[in-house]
């Protein structure tokens, strides 16, 4: 449960500061996987499976809509180079808007039925750790709304920021791409309402015969009827407030956060570079492993092992053969020297080893 909350918060905070359209959606996926882990940690496996199924629809719609935008804009992935595409890609805009609102758990869209329920279940466990998970999930939900607004605004609603040539060639995707977009948009709206009773309905067995939840962990009823209405509506209220605030700031200056102060630049860099985890990981672990590999390759593989292995043996045989080949020089004096040297060696062996039988 704690791991899921940290994952959801981490991925949402990192995704908020990304500028690549595919990275934003990818970190959003990571954040929603954290929400599923929260549900699993609460032993609400049916809710986790419900969120998995519903999340698949609107996230697939987001990825396909992003692909439609990339197809129109010449594979440009930085949405700071987009803007004004609502007039060129109205269908893609509609699908991405619906999928983003479902991702942000706007009421009565598919994401609302599972995502908000997971947050409510965290509070309904009534323990310190579950309260911590609840607040981390609420913050992650607010971040989700923020980067959804950022993605929609900078891609479709702001002024054109890209090269003129991209806009001249931009067009809506063909029907083989738009038909799946329409289907996923409809699922992002209706699938949650259709499947809610199957997954978490009080009067339906649903997955009761395939998923076992211990009676001590059944908190769905207490959460549904005993949770204060304020705690149920808090994620939605904060998300709407943050969405309005971000729209106002984006309308004034889309890049206000970067250029406001040096501190804000450092904060932006910190989250954009994923808490510097990759930098620390590369310098502390990867660099050491690569250096160890270099030493191993230089000293062992190309050093000791080569010296005593194939290269060393080949050189030894070659040098020995060259040495013995030097005796074949045609010189009678050298032949005599070799012959008498061999005779002396035999005599020494006979004298030093009395029991040896040489003759």
Tell me the role of every PLM-derived stretch.
Residues 4, 99, 177-190, 210-215, ...:
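Hydrophobic membrane-spanning alpha-helices of multi-pass integral membrane proteins
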Residues 87-96, 171-186, 334-339:
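Alpha-helical transmembrane segments and their helix-start/interface "positive-inside/aromatic belt" motifs
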Residues 97, 144, 184-190, 242, ...:
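Hydrophobic alpha-helical transmembrane segments of multi-pass integral membrane proteins
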Residues 45-48, 52, 131, 135, ...:
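Hydrophobic, aromatic-rich alpha-helical transmembrane segments
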Residues 96-104, 180-199, 274, 290-296:
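Hydrophobic alpha-helical membrane-insertion segments
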Residues 1-169, 187, 193:
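Hydrophobic transmembrane alpha-helices and their helix-loop junctions in integral membrane proteins
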Residues 203-233, 237, 249-359:
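Aromatic-capped, Gly/Pro-kinked transmembrane alpha-helices
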Residues 59-63, 131-172, 179-183, 196-200, ...:
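Predominantly late transmembrane helices and immediately cytosolic-facing juxtamembrane segments
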